[in-house]
């Protein structure tokens, strides 16, 4: 053939014909040249992240690794070729991505057919496949080029969004055929807007790795468990998927709605038309008829519908002529689930042919537009693959964000208020918190002002001729701190002779001890018991002086009786 594109398509058709020999699943999807490049970009970024770097990769590194990967898998790499750094890990991650998505790339299909010993593989050599994947290939003479008219506002918008809308339609169809394809799910998870952004995709990705399931099966099982499982089987409240319950429910129910079309519609033409119409109406819901996105979605749906009908007509012509080369169809008289599960089998085969034709397309010429998608400009809420898979992974040992760590340190230094600042009448029974103590030091009362933090014992000179002024000062201090002392008792103490110097010294020592005790308990509220003890101790110390005065003390009413009898 003149064009490698037709050879690649012929190779894929033979793979579908002999799939029981070369593949494990009939619904294995094929990864085209563009998807191979996107998968390699994700593998490179994942390896960089495992090596302690960011989840990112430069465009030049992707293109250099891409050329070496294609040559190495085809066995055309020279010995003196420079091997990219960490190539073994990159290839392992690349193959793991494809395996988890139940997909095969074009090189894998070529190797499987060559290993099977089929003569069909000789129609396309490894050098031709290398040129097809790495270089700009020649197009056949009959290839139709899109004719673009003079740019206007509506036409320019339609031309820009058409390729993106086509990928969205094909991703939905790919997910219906192959439920394990995580790349197809990533393109349509939030398209249209369902509130399932990067955070939701990250939570789904982590859960799928823990359960060793595809992302779509994780979302489906989560919704089914909530709807049908009951309280005993419901997910825990700490499940990270619970906060995305509404969006996941909308997504799963829409896929269920598309799957119902397979079972209810037996004609593949009608089923394909209904599928495309349902996807289109779901995308343009809420938009006017003159909206550029609505017009572009309508055109893309019509083009895909025509291609599906064309493929069905080709199969009908081949069956009528009997030149298909495919084994005859088994009789359906005793087929299990006739009209239900097997009703959409022809539709699935038609969709697989449509997806295979897209996989056989040559790679995009502008690699920068393909790999470096605009993160801010999202159509219908759909993010690029690299943006979704770049979401940070949080584990138990992963450090938190810097803002969270700074806020935690600030909150740790702040004193916590345990009790209300308005103190009740029972405040003396509470233990003051650090904040209350700080407030007391900022605004102390007159009875709590300390002279110093560690007061030394006061040296009071005791002289007989200078005792009276010292007693006056002492009495003033006692009057301020103890209001329950009788004034008469204070006057008696003041008029005592100088011979009671020992008692006065003991009083001064007691006052000093009391002051030290007060300084040690300044944070405690003043208690009346201390005043009572001070008064009783003073009375005990003055017992000797009161014995003399008690001899002349009269009983109540004794003075009146004495004056009466004297008369």
From Swiss-Prot:
Write the record's keywords in alphabetical order, separated by commas. Cytoplasm, DNA damage, DNA repair, DNA-binding, Nucleus
Q: Is Amino-acid biosynthesis one of the keywords?
A: no
Q: Name one GO biological process term.
A: DNA repair
Question: Where are the compositionally biased (Polar residues) regions?
Answer: 512-524, 534-552
As one GO molecular function, the record gives: DNA binding
Cellular component GO terms held in the UniProt record: chromatin; cytoplasm; nucleus
Localization, per the record, is: Cytoplasm; Nucleus
What residue spans carry the region label Disordered?
485-552
Q: Which family does it belong to?
A: Belongs to the PARI family.
- Outline what the protein does: Required to suppress inappropriate homologous recombination, thereby playing a central role DNA repair and in the maintenance of genomic stability.
Q: What is this protein called?
A: PCNA-interacting partner
Upper taxonomic classification of the species?
A: Eukaryota, Metazoa, Chordata, Craniata, Vertebrata
